[in-house]
Every structure is written in structure tokens, then in C-alpha cells.
């Protein structure tokens, strides 16, 4: 039986074909065939149609997913300090992660030297410079419906968090509402899957348009973008996490490094934190963490800890801003940090959702969503790397919380025994 190509394989093929066709079309003489029928017709319909479908899902998916994510955290009230410490760690490290990627993006400037402003019908709206206080005030919606209609993502996120928190507090009284939101979220996630089915066609149209109008110069910029993301992931995993673990627990990172590869192999190959949950929790228990901590922090981290994803969003936003010649300013950068950090609460582990969340961040600062088309082809490779970093963050948080709660067996942590390997050998 002939094996079907995966969506990832189809996207890679579409990117390669789009690149080749785009370069070929660029060599054609100027005229209506090239500009109107091919670039402005076929390529535009495929590329812009896909982008419009992604835009369609941004607000409803963000509202439903974040509401469900917050509403599901009802057990934080009973867990008290564990819940508070876990949330503070996850949100703080996400903010640090995106700040690192933004700094690296401005240092390396992956999008400088390539002008893509001619590829959009409307010029991007340059984010107005705002103070820190203005950004905080702008997060509060005076009219949630208007915020959704206008695509004001910071306000949509804020309302979603408050709405989800209220559902969590009321508990059983509003169980029907919670079930309705969960069903609604499932519908929107399924819609994402349906839209992603057409991703290869969209990627072909977007990549072909890019290379037909800018040439192979775009490829060099894409490599620099990948370098920013990978360097950001490396710094966050090796410096930030190691430093935080040492500062708050005085533990050596080496026992964790020795026992994490079994988890990393799963997250890297599947690009899913959820797929590695059982092995991750077993590994934490093997490292001496009490199950009452790991059974809470690991599943919660798989839901709201998206440091690797935040690094991608920060780098991609600056990359796309540079491509279109937009200076975000301090207000725009703060908006990106706030939006990506808060959005991490509702980012689901479903292929394609990361792109929807990225389009939300781009919308929050007035950048063209069309820029996503250039990075889609390499996103799968980066996704495997950033998912692994996400899981490392879950584990480091678990170790810190367990140490602070006094439920970390340090003799087990520094032990060379590998319970999982022994268990597998017995079975």
C-alpha cells in the first residue's frame, strides 16, 4: 500500500516548487501575463486566500482557547502556593524568552536589505510609540465585542482571561457554559486542521510571489531568521534555565541533562509536548520529584508554557517588520511581549495553531500577515526545536517548585539509576 505524504512533506515540497516557479516567473518579460495573470492572479488567489482563512480564525480561536485554558485551572485554588509559583515561573520565563529573541533579531537584523512592502495592497500601520502605562491601560476593553470586531488582540486576550477566570471561580454553577466553550474550542481547532489541509497551496502561492518579485535574496534572509530562532532557543535552554535552576535551588543541571534525552527524543520527533507527557512525568519522578507536584506542573506546562514558541513569535515579528520597513518602536515591542506572553495561556498543541497565534501577534502591531508565508516552509524544523525547549522549561519549573515545597528527594536527583530504562528492560 502506497504511503501518503504527511502535511509537513507536502509543505516542504510546495515551498521548493514555489521557489523554483517564482524564480522562473521572475525571468519572464514584464507584461500582463506575468504581472496580472500569474503573480496578480494565480499566485495571489492561492496565497491571499490561505492568509484570509487564517485571519478568519484568529479572534474566535484566541477567545475560545484562552477562555478554556484559564477555566481549566480551577485546581490552582486548592494547590495554593504550587499553582502560584508555577504560573509565575511560566509567564515570567515566556516574557524573558520573547525579549531574548527580539534582542537577537535586532542584533542580527534578518529582514534588513529585503524590501517586501510592494507585496501588500495596503501599507503596514506603524505602531505608535506608547508608554508602559498606556500599554497596560489599552489591555482593558471598554467594549469586548468591539475589541473582537476590530481585532484588538490585547483586549481580546484580557477579556478571555477574565471570562475564563470567572468560569473557574463559579465552578459547577456554570458547567454548561464551560462545556459549551470547550465544544466551541474543539470546533475552531478542527477548522484550523481544515484550513491547514490547504496550506501547501497557500505556501506555494506565497513563496512563488515572494521569489517572483524579490528573487533569491529572500533565501538569505530566511536563513538569518532561522539562525535568530535557533540561537534564541539555545541561549534560553542553556543559560536562562540553567541559571534559574541554580539561583532558586542550588541544584546542578547535570543529572537533569543526563536523563532528559529520552523525553527530548519524543518531543523533537513529534513536535508535541502532549505526546511526551507520560515519559516526562516519569522522568521527573525518577529525578526525585513528588508526583503531587509533577502531576500538576507538567500537564499545566504543556498547556501554557510556550517559551520556545514565544522565541519564534518574537523573532518572526521583528523579521517581518524589517521586511516591510516598519519601525515598531518601544510601544510596539511592549505590545508584542505582552501579546505573545498572554497568548501562551491558550496556545493548543495542534499543528497550525502556532501560525494563527503568530498572525494574532502581527495583527496587534499592524503588520501584514502575508509575511508568514515566507517562514512557513521552515517552521516544522523550528517547531521540533522549540517544542523541546518548551518541555525543558516544564521540567525546570517542576524541579524548582518541588524544591521550594520540600518534596524533592535530592538523593534520587543525583542518583545514576534510570528507573525508566530498568522498567523497559523488565517489560
Task: Label each PLM-derived region with a short phrase.
Residues 18, 59-67, 76, 101, ...:
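Alpha-helical transmembrane segments of polytopic integral membrane proteins
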Residues 34-42, 80, 216-224, 251-261, ...:
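Membrane-water interface of transmembrane alpha-helices in multipass transporters/channels
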Residues 6, 50, 79, 148, ...:
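Residue-level signature of catalytic and energy-coupling elements of molecular machines
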Residues 257-313, 338-355, 378-401:
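Alpha-helical membrane segments and immediately flanking helix-loop junctions
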Residues 71-78, 113, 171-175, 183-186, ...:
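Juxtamembrane helix-boundary/capping and inter-helix hinge elements in multi-pass membrane proteins
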Residues 2-4, 8-12, 19-27, 31, ...:
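Signature of multi-pass transmembrane helix bundles
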Residues 77-85, 190-197, 286-302, 330-331, ...:
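Membrane-interface alpha-helices at helix entry/exit sites of multi-pass transporters
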Residues 113, 314-427:
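Transmembrane alpha-helical segments and their short flanking loops
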Amino acid at each position: 500500500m502506497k504511503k501518503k505524504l504527511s502535511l509537513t512533506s507536502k509543505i516542504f515540497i510546495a515551498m521548493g516548487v514555489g521557489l523554483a516557479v517564482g524564480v522562473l516567473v521572475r525571468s519572464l518579460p514584464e507584461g500582463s501575463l506575468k504581472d496580472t495573470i500569474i503573480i496578480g492572479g494565480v499566485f495571489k488567489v492561492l496565497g491571499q486566500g490561505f492568509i484570509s482563512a487564517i485571519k478568519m480564525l484568529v479572534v474566535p480561536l484566541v477567545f475560545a482557547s484562552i477562555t478554556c485554558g484559564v477555566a481549566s485551572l480551577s485546581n490552582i485554588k486548592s494547590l495554593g502556593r504550587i499553582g502560584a509559583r508555577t504560573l509565575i515561573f511560566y509567564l515570567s520565563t515566556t516574557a524573558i524568552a520573547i525579549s531574548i529573541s527580539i534582542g537577537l533579531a535586532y542584533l542580527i537584523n534578518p529582514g534588513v536589505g529585503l524590501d517586501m512592502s510592494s507585496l501588500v495592497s495596503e501599507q503596514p500601520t506603524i505602531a505608535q510609540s506608547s508608554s508602559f502605562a498606556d500599554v497596560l491601560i489599552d489591555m482593558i476593553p471598554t467594549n469586548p465585542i468591539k475589541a473582537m470586531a476590530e481585532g484588538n488582540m490585547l483586549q481580546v486576550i484580557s477579556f478571555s482571561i477574565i471570562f475564563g477566570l470567572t468560569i473557574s471561580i463559579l465552578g459547577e454553577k456554570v458547567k454548561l457554559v464551560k462545556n459549551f466553550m470547550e465544544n466551541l474550542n474543539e470546533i475552531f481547532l478542527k477548522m484550523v486542521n481544515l484550513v491547514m489541509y490547504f496550506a501547501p497551496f497557500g505556501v506555494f502561492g506565497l513563496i512563488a510571489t515572494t521569489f517572483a518579485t524579490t528573487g533569491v535574496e529572500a533565501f538569505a534572509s530566511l536563513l538569518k531568521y532561522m539562525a535568530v530562532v535557533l540561537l534564541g532557543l539555545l541561549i534560553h535552554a542553556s543559560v536562562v534555565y540553567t541559571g534559574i535552576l541554580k539561583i532558586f535551588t542550588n541544584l546542578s543541571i547535570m543529572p537533569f541533562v543526563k536523563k532528559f534525552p529520552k523525553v527530548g527524543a519524543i518531543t523533537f520527533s513529534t513536535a508535541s509536548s502532549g505526546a511526551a507527557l507520560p515519559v516526562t512525568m516519569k522522568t521527573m519522578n525518577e529525578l526525585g520529584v513528588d508526583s503531587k507536584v509533577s502531576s500538576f506542573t507538567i500537564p499545566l506546562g504543556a498547556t501554557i508554557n510556550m517559551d520556545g514558541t514565544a522565541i519564534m513569535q518574537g523573532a518572526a515579528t521583528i523579521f517581518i517588520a524589517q521586511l516591510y520597513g516598519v519601525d515598531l518602536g518601544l510601544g510596539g515591542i511592549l505590545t508584542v511581549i505582552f501579546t505573545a506572553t498572554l497568548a501562551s495561556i491558550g496556545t493548543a498543541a495542534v499543528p497550525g495553531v502556532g501560525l494563527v497565534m503568530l498572525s494574532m501577534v502581527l495583527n496587534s502591531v499592524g503588520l501584514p500577515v502575508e509575511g508568514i508565508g515566507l517562514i512557513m516552509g521552515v517552521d516544522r524544523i523550528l517547531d521540533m526545536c522549540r517544542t523541546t525547549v518548551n518541555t525543558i522549561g516544564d521540567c525546570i519549573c517542576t524541579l524548582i517548585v518541588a524544591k521550594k515545597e520540600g518534596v524533592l528527594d535530592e538523593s534520587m536527583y543525583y542518583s545514576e539509576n534510570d528507573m525508566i530504562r530498568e522498567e523497559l528492560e523488565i517489560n
